[in-house]
Amino acid sequence: MIHIKSPQEILTMKKAGEILGEVLETVMNSIQEGMTELEIDALAERLIREKGGEPGFKKVPGYHHTICISVNDVVVHGIPTARKVKKGDVVGVDCGVYLDGFHTDMAETVLLPLGNKSDEAKEKFLKAGKDALFNAIFQVKAGNRVGNVSIQMQNVEKMGYSIVKSLVGHGVGRDLHEDPEIPGFLAKPIRKSPLFKENMTVAVEIIYNMG
């Protein structure tokens, strides 16, 4: 069932999203060689609580961390450990803020620099995903369909990358994961995919591999 939010609920989610955006920006800018995944997790939790939110992922039964962290060949949903990140690592952080009964969900990925060297293949990989993601987000509007979003993300396949089809974006609100599912590939004809309506709230996620 797809939940349509009220204007007040939208304002609450917007505030939670602003907190999450600020937290994730600080976290990603703070990641450096030698930090452990658990230290990154602790930083995210501290910042969320300082801003008046709660770690949304900790409300998932059985999950005890603020973030999921995915390094290099981990796709998504990696659990923070004592592993230290190093130069050249691709580090993805997925995080959620819970505020006044509503969830938000956001992820960001960075490439830890190799000093004076560059890694053009990884930089190209990350740019392709970010460009496709923003093109997809621009399609989230009343009257469009989920397929309009999915096909934009699937465009990374034209660059030789592959979409992970077992993991998808989703609605978000009172629950962290709500309908509709938003795959990064065209799972059905666009006209048969769910219709976006005003005051729907979704998490658009591009999940893809280099190979």
Positions of predicted regions on the chain:
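Active-site neighborhoods and metal-handling regions in enzymes and metal-associated proteins
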Residues: 1-211
